[in-house]
Amino acid sequence: MIQKNWQELIKPSKLDVTPGDDSKRFATIIAEPLERGFGLTLGNALRRILLSSLQGAAITSVHIDGVLHEFSSIPGVREDVTDIILNIKDIAIKMQGEGPKRMVLKKQGPGKVLAGDIGAVGDVQILNPNLVICTLDEGAEIRMEFTVNTGKGYVAADRNRAEDAPIGLIPVDSLYSPVKKVSYKVENTREGQILDYDKLTLQIETNGSLTPEDAVAFSARILQDQLNVFVNFEEPRREEATPSIPELAFNPALLKKVDELELSVRSANCLKNDNIVYIGDLIQKTEAEMLRTPNFGRKSLNEIKEVLAQMGLHLGMEVTGWPPDNIDELAKRFEEHY
């Protein structure tokens, strides 16, 4: 009775995922049918988790040679440090291992300084290498050292400021979340003749470090893990029905194949050549019929009679209902049970 609380609620059998132009960044994910009200419940919960709770990587601080604080300007650089830091915050990063990691950028002008100019470090990948960080004039030079770490959600620059940080190390606002945008809508949908069900549509954009489909999967796992504490009972165990062999009009031992009997090679080959497959086929043969089998002699006959006698069987028996229509299936089930 208690299981009906959750077992009898309708739930979607699978998700319908439609990738966008860039399948690593954009996707529309549809779940249907859902019980009335569950579209809003799940959509709102998943959206909040997608935006706030997934792990990602981001720059936490930057050191620029010759710069003491963010309200400075750099000779030969068109942007001031405040603008440079705003651009740095937009660098999308994917990091497989744990942080923190150091990354260095060094470039001479003239020209634009891009995120892709940052030197590669092990398992750290820049996902938007064409992002412009700043612009250098002729003869200008810039060197920056970045600190990259992992985390979740949004962390303000003040929280990234270490007490023992050296002079010139500028903390940066860190947006760790790999999900940039999430929207959802709930519509009516049909299941059979019933229209009173929900259809949940999620539209997700990530920074490329995580696919939208994986982002939803991880978010659902987080929600599942948080809800486990509210389940204060053990689910009653289901009694699994044990499949049984149906009532047979004959001894089920007749479904055993003759090649499983301990016969000599000569006797086994004679039965095989005469297309005798099951014991049920064999016992309906008379002694005279067996002796007419090519290469089958009295010695083989006596051997077979002895083996059958040990099973309480003999040649020349009449078997009602043999052979059954589904003999191969019955033989397999017999093998599993006996």
Curated annotation (Swiss-Prot):
Highest taxon above the source species: Bacteria
EC number(s) on file: 2.7.7.6
Region (Alpha C-terminal domain (alpha-CTD)) residue spans: 250-338
Protein keywords: DNA-directed RNA polymerase, Nucleotidyltransferase, Transcription, Transferase
GO molecular function: DNA binding; DNA-directed RNA polymerase activity; protein dimerization activity
Keyword flag Lipid metabolism: no
Alpha N-terminal domain (alpha-NTD), as annotated region: 1-234
Annotated GO CC locations: cytoplasm; DNA-directed RNA polymerase complex
Catalytic activity: RNA(n) + a ribonucleoside 5'-triphosphate = RNA(n+1) + diphosphate
Gene3D superfamilies hit by this protein: 5' to 3' exonuclease, C-terminal subdomain, DNA-directed RNA polymerase, insert domain, RNA polymerase, RBP11-like subunit
Biological processes per GO annotation: DNA-templated transcription
NCBIfam families noted in UniProt: PRK05182.1-2, PRK05182.2-5, rpoA
Family: Belongs to the RNA polymerase alpha chain family.
Function: DNA-dependent RNA polymerase catalyzes the transcription of DNA into RNA using the four ribonucleoside triphosphates as substrates.
Domain free text: The N-terminal domain is essential for RNAP assembly and basal transcription, whereas the C-terminal domain is involved in interaction with transcriptional regulators and with upstream promoter elements.
Subunit field text: Homodimer. The RNAP catalytic core consists of 2 alpha, 1 beta, 1 beta' and 1 omega subunit. When a sigma factor is associated with the core the holoenzyme is formed, which can initiate transcription.
Full protein name: DNA-directed RNA polymerase subunit alpha
Species, as recorded: Beijerinckia indica subsp. indica (strain ATCC 9039 / DSM 1715 / NCIMB 8712)
Origin organism lineage: Bacteria, Pseudomonadati, Pseudomonadota, Alphaproteobacteria, Hyphomicrobiales
Gene it is expressed from: rpoA
